[in-house]
Swiss-Prot record:
Disulfide bridge map: none
PANTHER family, alphabetized: UPF0234 PROTEIN YAJQ
Organism: Syntrophotalea carbinolica (strain DSM 2380 / NBRC 103641 / GraBd1)
Protein name per Swiss-Prot or TrEMBL: Nucleotide-binding protein Pcar_0033
GO cellular component, as recorded: cytosol
Classification via InterPro entries: DUF520 (IPR007551), UPF0234-like_C (IPR035571), UPF0234_N (IPR035570), YajQ-like_sf (IPR036183)
Gene Ontology molecular-function annotations: nucleotide binding
Family: Belongs to the YajQ family.
Top-rank taxon, per record: Bacteria
Keywords linked to the UniProt accession: Nucleotide-binding
Pfam families membership: DUF520
Function of the protein: Nucleotide-binding protein.
Length: 161
């Protein structure tokens, strides 16, 4: 019985490269001269520090641009609240989302069931397995999910016939 898996994974090496490139740009840009701005990668999060709100927004724009150049979707980033640091500085934690949560998995399964295609979807840990009798139905599910915005970046792997 043909099947495939739906996952949400991020290449941490690409994120590390994008963070390093963004940090280089921030250190060299004229509008950041004389101010303390930084980007740090910590395990499953990125910590952004800006001299003020304007500078923090500019740091975020630089980071998003570098991620886009490295083909990493900004949907994998979960921006936390801005919190004050020392003086006028502002800090923000950005969590890196990996895997499909139970709620998102249920939402994906519901979308697939509402499509009336003859396939079954089941949640397995941090991924969703879709199986059906025809490969054409599975390809229709892939097209359906690519057209929908579920809030996270989806990859389709392990297509078996």
């Amino acid at each position: 019985m043909p099947s495939f898996d739906i996952v949400s994974k991020v290449d941490m090496q690409e994120i590390d490269n994008a963070v390093n490139q963004a940090l280089k740009e921030i250190l060299q840009r004229y509008d950041f001269k004389g101010t303390h701005n930084e980007i740090k990668l910590e395990n499953e999060a990125i910590v952004l520090l800006g001299a003020d709100d304007y500078k923090l927004d500019a740091v975020i724009d630089v980071l998003k641009g570098k991620l886009a150049k490295r083909n990493v979707s900004p949907k994998c980033l979960d921006f936390g609240k801005k919190e004050p640091a020392s003086g006028t500085a502002v800090r923000q934690r950005v969590a890196i989302v990996q895997g499909i949560s139970k709620e998102k998995g249920k939402e994906i399964c519901k979308l697939i069931k509402n499509s009336k295609l003859k396939v079954q979807a089941q949640i397995m840990d941090d991924q969703v397995r879709v199986s059906g009798k025809k490969i054409d139905d599975l390809q229709s599910v892939i097209q359906l999910l690519k057209g929908q915005d579920v809030g996270i970046e989806l990859q389709f792997i392990n297509m078996r016939s």
